[in-house]
Amino acid sequence: MIDFDGYRPNVGIVICNAERQVLWAKRYGQNSWQFPQGGINDNETAEQAMYRELYEEAGLTPKDVEILYVSKHWLRYKLPKRLLRHDNRPICIGQKQRWFLLQLVSDEKRINMQHTKSPEFDGWRWVSFWYPVRQVVTFKKDVYRKVMKEFALFLFDTNLKSRLSVPEEKKMFSSVKKKLIHKKNHKYSSNQ
């Protein structure tokens, strides 16, 4: 299913552990890493698609995770021209994604990327929260930056800010907080 603008509806999944690390998955047969994601089928809600993709790509079921947060808006990225399939109609120019932040509540041994006949991933690891923003393929960086900033506002409280060990994490969290304060102050002053 492709929308009128040429974007395929899709879900993205960020799974975190108790240490607030996130699951980073290696594409099958490649040296390319990303979060699990997948298309939303006709007659399927975003949440239903997320659970289906979660099982297909990571072998996890609804009882293995808890939904912590869902992105407020659809986030879009365009595919590079070299990845466009011109033999398909309509042409898909990119993905529009609804993102889910999940907490793994079962043992990590339940994660199984190889349980289907054609797995999307052949490996995974836990990485620091902001690591994917720096490492994902270029055309997805903006979406990853936006979704991780949105999730950070939910996942990290101000008490945790002082305990973050990576300077970039401190810097990014600080900039997100400043933007929110600026927006809040601007909104307050414009309402008078």
Curated annotation (Swiss-Prot):
GO terms for molecular function: mRNA 5'-diphosphatase activity. Its cofactor is a divalent metal cation. The keyword Hydrolase applies. GO terms for biological process: mRNA catabolic process. InterPro entries: Nudix_hydrolase, NUDIX_hydrolase-like_dom_sf, NUDIX_hydrolase_CS, NUDIX_hydrolase_dom, RppH. Coiled coil: none annotated. GO terms for cellular component: cytoplasm. It is an enzyme of class 3 (hydrolase). A motif (Nudix box) lies at residues 38-59. The keyword Hydrolase applies. Pfam families: NUDIX. Its EC number is 3.6.1.-. Gene3D superfamilies: Nucleoside Triphosphate Pyrophosphohydrolase (3.90.79.10). Residues 6-149 form the Nudix hydrolase domain. NCBIfam families: PRK00714.1-1, PRK00714.1-4, PRK00714.1-5. Accelerates the degradation of transcripts by removing pyrophosphate from the 5'-end of triphosphorylated RNA, leading to a more labile monophosphorylated state that can stimulate subsequent ribonuclease cleavage. Belongs to the Nudix hydrolase family. RppH subfamily. This is RNA pyrophosphohydrolase. The lineage of its organism: Bacteria, Pseudomonadati, Pseudomonadota, Gammaproteobacteria, Pasteurellales. The gene is rppH.
